[in-house]
Amino acid sequence: MDNKTFEEIVVLWQADKKQYVKRSTYSAYSLLIANHLLPAFAGVNDVTEILVQDFVFTKLQQGLSQKSIKDILIVLKMILRYGVKQGYLEHREIDVKFPTERERQEVEVLSRNNQKRIMEYVQSHFTFMNLGIYICLCAGLRIGEV
């Protein structure tokens, strides 16, 4: 077996995957890898269930949603499967558990009065940044969509 670090396997996986997925999908994978997977597993030779479980708890503590973490884990498992298939890693089952949600986070929404005040301010103090804020308010965009 040709042992490689997680980072080396990622580079090979990306080169292989690029041929088969759309550019937007490849970009999404690359973003998840750069922002989450490489900082956590870059120098690791053996990605274990314990490491992945710790990674999940860390991401939850940082405020990522379970859905976002599950999306990251899908990419991680694709990379690990590729590593096994190519003979760089031994097959290993990784069963990650998520804690039950005890309390729902309250979504903060602007009141009509506050929205009106912001829109009046933006209209009287024009800048291109304020124009962007105005458009977002009028279109109903959420913070994560901006």
List the predicted regions and their residue ranges:
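N-terminal intrinsically disordered, low-complexity tails enriched in polar/charged
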Residues: 1-2, 139
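Basic, Lys/Arg- and aromatic-enriched nucleic-acid-binding interface segment
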Residues: 70, 85, 89-91, 95-143
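N-terminal core-binding DNA-recognition domain of tyrosine site-specific recombinases/integrases
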Residues: 2-4, 14-82, 86-88, 104
